[in-house]
Amino acid sequence: MSLGIGIIGAGGRMGRMLIEVVHRQPGVHVAAATDRTGGEAVGRDAGELAGQGSLGVPIGDDIPAAVAASDAVIDFSLPEATETVAAACAEAGRPLVLGTTGLGETQREAVHRLAEQVAVMHAANYSTGVTLLTALVEQAARAIGVYSDIEIIEAHHRHKVDAPSGTALRLGEAVADALGRDLSQCAVYGREGHTGERDPQTIGFETIRAGDIVGDHTVLFGGDGERVELTHKASSRTTFASGAVRAAAWVVEQPPGLYDMRDMIGV
């Protein structure tokens, strides 16, 4: 039986890519799609919006109705919608794949409450390559982190509105956790002017916004006489959309709880 997927934020870049990937992938179909009230995508056919021809699925702005019409929900919209999506998933008993980054405290709490009732996958990045990178970064941090200056460099397209990226922050958390540090206390975001010598306990973040870069992330471990750089470069958003669709098929089989991509691929 085909799995019906509801796509929240269908009018955005990732939303359109999700429609395309779901349409092309066997075993799943677009059951419902929403965009923000007043958005240009509302009222259009989801398939036509994504360049896939008519799917007979109009894009609406009623999140609870879209969630109820779906077997699983994928949300790549904005943090402002997260609490509404979580409440709708709780009411309908639908598992959620959440790709929204930049969540505030109340939004994170809503996600955690939802995970007590249904399976929730929340990841900053749905690429299997980035998931593997995170595991490798943890290993490197445990092996050489205490002897290294650690910097995280990320690059994205000019339209990205948050910095550092959610993926960069997750990589920073992986390093900090491996070293027993608190990222909120040791992170340094950019440098300017007379900064003095580098504090060896810090984890640095550098951000690049330019052109149409899909997403590059490098974690650099700098030691005396050598350095190790672990890098992932995405060339297409398809990798993120495909990972999210695989996650949706996975979460419907899981008990209630909060999961990430590492749970799914086993690293």
Curated annotation (Swiss-Prot):
Its main location: cytoplasm. Keywords: Amino-acid biosynthesis, Cytoplasm, Diaminopimelate biosynthesis, Lysine biosynthesis, NAD, NADP, Oxidoreductase. One of its GO terms (biological process) is diaminopimelate biosynthetic process. It is found in: Cytoplasm. One of its GO terms (molecular function) is NADP binding. Gene3D superfamilies: Dihydrodipicolinate Reductase, domain 2, NAD(P)-binding Rossmann-like Domain. It catalyses: (S)-2,3,4,5-tetrahydrodipicolinate + NAD(+) + H2O = (2S,4S)-4-hydroxy-2,3,4,5-tetrahydrodipicolinate + NADH + H(+); (S)-2,3,4,5-tetrahydrodipicolinate + NADP(+) + H2O = (2S,4S)-4-hydroxy-2,3,4,5-tetrahydrodipicolinate + NADPH + H(+). SUPFAM superfamilies: Glyceraldehyde-3-phosphate dehydrogenase-like, C-terminal domain (SSF55347), NAD(P)-binding Rossmann-fold domains (SSF51735). NAD(+) binds at residues 9-14, 35, 99-101, 123-126. Its EC number is 1.17.1.8. It comes from the Bacteria. PANTHER family: 4-HYDROXY-TETRAHYDRODIPICOLINATE REDUCTASE 1, CHLOROPLASTIC-RELATED, DIHYDRODIPICOLINATE REDUCTASE. This is 4-hydroxy-tetrahydrodipicolinate reductase. It comes from Halorhodospira halophila (strain DSM 244 / SL1).
